[in-house]
Amino acid sequence: MQKYILLLLLIVMASCKSKSPNSGSETKEAYSRYVKMDFKEVNSAKKNRAYDLGKRLLETCNTSKFKSFSKEEATESVIKNATVEKISKTCQKIIMRNGKFIDLQLSEVIHDVETDDYLFKYKIQYEKKYFERELNVKINKDGKVAAMSTKELAKKPM
């Protein structure tokens, strides 16, 4: 019986052996798929495309007239999803909560290294300053809008 306990104790001790610590010679280079870009480094054509189409979409809320995107401006999925019904429904919610749209202010540009897409994040300025909203416009490598979305930013505690 003592032999079994001793054998069991030996097995438990051997299985609990810790791994050898890293010697530090095996350093891996940090790789990040998403890189935050400086505004000046970004292609001005892509920057202008994102701003113009984002502003055109948000001004629809003020004027109730939506000019649909062309195939040169946006991908098929964006054209298909940007319907007058969807936009007007979203605009009604936003206008009730934020008031009329005033302008966009570029806050961040993120480059996806693998797909060569650029994500432009804009702070949306509205009449009412109670809630902050952000517009995200994704431009693909062909210079077309691949995605557009808006979201309300969380309030920062004082």
Predicted regions and their residues:
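Sec-dependent signal peptide recognition
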Residues: Q2-L7
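Short, low-complexity N-terminal intrinsically disordered segments enriched in polar/charged residues
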Residues: K17-T60
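Core segments of small alpha/beta cavity-forming domains
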Residues: V42-I79, K86
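Signal peptide-directed secreted proteins
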Residues: Y51-L57, K93, L153-M158
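Short solvent-exposed beta->alpha transition segments
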Residues: S68-V113
